[in-house]
Amino acid sequence: MKLRPMQDRIIVKRVEEETKTAGGIYIPETAKEKPQEGEVVAVGNGKRTEDGKILPLDVKVGDKVLFGKYSGTEVKVEGQDYLIMREDDILGVIEK
C-alpha cells in the first residue's frame, strides 16, 4: 500500500462481514451493516505532545480492533477500501 498515516492516525481494513446468518439465511447487500471490526494495516509515528515529544501508539500493524459506527474517513487506495482514523477512535483491541 502506498499510503502512510500521519501522527496518531491509523489505517484500518474492515473485516469481511458474513453474508449468511447462523440459521442459513443469506443477507442481501442492501440490508448489511458495515462491520465495526477491522485489522490495522498501517500506523503513524505517534501523537505529538504540547512540548514536542512524540508518544508512540498503543496499536500496531496486524492488531484486530473494534471502532465506533461512524469512526474514520473512508478512502479507496489501489481498488481497496480502507478507513483512516485517529487512535482515539479505537474502542478496543481483540486479543488472540
From Swiss-Prot:
<protein>
    <recommendedName>
        <fullName>Co-chaperonin GroES</fullName>
    </recommendedName>
</protein>
<dbReference type="GO" id="GO:0005524">
    <property type="term" value="F:ATP binding"/>
</dbReference>
<keyword id="KW-0963">Cytoplasm</keyword>
<dbReference type="GO" id="GO:0044183">
    <property type="term" value="F:protein folding chaperone"/>
</dbReference>
<comment type="subunit">
    <text>Heptamer of 7 subunits arranged in a ring. Interacts with the chaperonin GroEL.</text>
</comment>
<dbReference type="InterPro" id="IPR020818">
    <property type="entry name" value="Chaperonin_GroES"/>
</dbReference>
<dbReference type="GO" id="GO:0051085">
    <property type="term" value="P:chaperone cofactor-dependent protein refolding"/>
</dbReference>
<dbReference type="GO" id="GO:0051082">
    <property type="term" value="F:unfolded protein binding"/>
</dbReference>
<dbReference type="GO" id="GO:0046872">
    <property type="term" value="F:metal ion binding"/>
</dbReference>
<comment type="function">
    <text>Together with the chaperonin GroEL, plays an essential role in assisting protein folding. The GroEL-GroES system forms a nano-cage that allows encapsulation of the non-native substrate proteins and provides a physical environment optimized to promote and accelerate protein folding. GroES binds to the apical surface of the GroEL ring, thereby capping the opening of the GroEL channel.</text>
</comment>
<dbReference type="Pfam" id="PF00166">
    <property type="entry name" value="Cpn10"/>
</dbReference>
<dbReference type="InterPro" id="IPR037124">
    <property type="entry name" value="Chaperonin_GroES_sf"/>
</dbReference>
<comment type="similarity">
    <text>Belongs to the GroES chaperonin family.</text>
</comment>
<dbReference type="GO" id="GO:0051087">
    <property type="term" value="F:protein-folding chaperone binding"/>
</dbReference>
<dbReference type="InterPro" id="IPR011032">
    <property type="entry name" value="GroES-like_sf"/>
</dbReference>
<dbReference type="GO" id="GO:0005737">
    <property type="term" value="C:cytoplasm"/>
</dbReference>
<keyword id="KW-0143">Chaperone</keyword>
